[in-house]
Design a protein with these regions (language model features):
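Conserved acidic carboxylate
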Residues: 9
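Charged docking surfaces used in two-component/phosphorelay signaling
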Residues: 16-24
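Short hydrophobic/Thr-rich beta-strand motif most characteristic of the beta2 strand and flanking loop
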Residues: 26-33, 41
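Acidic catalytic/metal-coordinating carboxylates
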Residues: 34-37, 60-63
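Active-site residues of response regulator receiver
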Residues: 53
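Receiver (REC) domain active-site loop signature in two-component systems and cognate sites
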Residues: 56
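Alpha4 helix (beta4-alpha4-beta5 surface) of REC/receiver domains from two-component response regulators
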Residues: 63, 83-110
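Hydrophobic/aromatic residues positioned on beta-strands within the core alpha/beta folds
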Residues: 78-80
Length: 122
């Protein structure tokens, strides 16, 4: 069975880009436009990994991170933002990784593989 990745991104073009790229790598991909939708997706069926934008309407990524971790600490979460300043925010330390947004998804894909491999070992 393919690992299920939840991509949480408010920018539609970027969300679709991530979805297509990750599907081409063999992952099952579900998406959410904001933190509130992400929490609903987690409640409906735990993804194997979450890629979480930070700056979003309705509920931002930091609030969503906090709420998701209260529900399930086992899901690896990658914070994904254009803003490098959030890397220093102590709340971001609760995530498993922080990857700066880029049109080259090599770093993100490598981090996904690494975290999913770690999850299987546990």
């Amino acid at each position: 069975m393919n690992e299920k990745i939840l991509v949480v991104e408010d920018e539609e073009g970027l969300r679709l880009f991530y979805e297509e790229e990750l599907k081409s790598e063999g992952y099952e991909v579900i998406t959410a436009r904001n933190g509130k939708e992400a929490i609903r997706q987690v409640e409906e069926g735990s993804p194997d990994l979450i890629i979480l934008d930070i700056v979003m309407p309705v509920m931002d990524g930091m609030e969503a991170l906090s709420r998701i971790l209260r529900k399930d600490r086992k899901i690896p979460i990658i914070l994904n933002s254009s803003y490098t300043g959030y890397r220093e925010d102590f709340m971001s330390w609760a995530a498993d990784a922080y990857v700066t947004k880029s049109t080259d998804l090599t770093g993100l894909k490598n981090k996904i593989q690494e975290l999913l491999k770690k999850k299987k070992v546990k």
